[in-house]
Every structure is written in structure tokens, then in C-alpha cells.
């Protein structure tokens, strides 16, 4: 599923530590959404995070916003290439400046919301990567 973008605002260069902090906050916020609706909190999975960060980095490097990635890969292929056997869904977004904005955007979109609130999913990996011009790209990969 894809989400649109918020209005772009000028940003300073973001470090990998800043991206990691953003990813952690997105994970926290989606777990608030899930647990408030009766689903278990998702566990962060390093393999799904690798797949998600890789796809976000590719989108940021190429300026492409798509579920289809490098070499026509999809989220299943990327997750399996990272060593995760049972991927369940993917959300992407771009342009949002805060974790709250991106999670709010996903929650307002029926398809993204369904992915986040799928109680059968047990794990998640989030990749937040900023392009050279400061545009953030997000990938959220879920697994069983």
C-alpha cells in the first residue's frame, strides 16, 4: 500500500541515528494503534528492518515511489532475500516529516490501516531513509 506525502518543508541533513530514531518511534506508534484495538504488539525483526531500509534507500536514491524495487523486486522477494521466510504485507510512504505524521497517514488509508491492524502479523521492520535533498522515504514490512 502507498500513502501520499505531506507538504515538504526544508530539512537539515538527517543522520543514520536520526533515521533509526524515527523508525523506533514509528514502531512504537503502530503498536499503540494495534494494542488499543486488541491486537498484540509487533516485535521488531532485524531481517524485515534490513529489507525495509534497503527498499527505502533505493527509493531515496532513485527518487522512485513504488512497491516495485530494484530489479523489479517486490516486498516478498526483498524480505526473503534478507532471510525472512513469511512476509505478510508492506506499506510505503514519502514526504512526511514526523513519525506521527506518517502513522496518521497510514491509519487514514483503509489499505494501510488493514495492514497495520492485521492481528495475524507478529513482526515488523521499518525503514526510514532521507534522500540527498532531504525527502524522507518510508517502508514498513510485516511478517507472520
Residue ranges and their predicted role:
Residues 9-19:
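Cleaved targeting-peptide boundary
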Residues 11, 27, 116:
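Alpha-helical and His/Cys-centered functional microenvironments
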Residues 14-15, 40, 84:
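Short amphipathic alpha-helical segments at helix-loop
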Residues 18-76, 120, 124, 131:
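Short, well-ordered surface patches within globular domains
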Residues 74-144:
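A well-ordered secondary-structure block
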Amino acid at each position: 500500500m502507498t500513502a501520499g506525502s505531506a507538504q515538504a518543508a526544508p530539512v537539515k541533513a538527517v543522520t543514520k541515528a536520526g533515521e533509526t530514531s524515527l523508525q523506533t518511534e514509528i514502531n512504537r506508534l503502530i503498536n499503540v494503534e494495534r494494542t488499543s484495538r486488541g491486537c498484540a504488539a509487533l516485535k521488531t525483526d532485524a531481517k524485515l528492518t534490513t529489507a525495509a531500509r534497503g527498499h527505502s534507500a533505493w527509493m531515496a536514491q532513485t527518487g522512485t515511489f513504488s512497491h516495485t524495487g530494484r530489479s523489479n523486486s517486490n516486498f516478498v522477494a526483498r524480505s526473503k532475500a534478507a532471510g525472512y521466510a513469511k512476509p505478510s504485507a508492506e506499506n510505503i510512504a514519502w514526504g512526511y516529516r514526523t513519525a506521527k505524521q506518517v502513522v496518521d497517514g497510514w491509519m487514514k488509508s483503509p489499505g494501510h490501516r488493514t495492514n497495520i491492524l492485521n492481528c495475524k502479523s507478529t513482526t515488523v521492520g521499518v525503514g526510514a531513509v532521507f534522500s540527498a535533498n532531504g525527502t524522507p522515504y518510508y517502508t514498513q514490512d510485516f511478517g507472520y
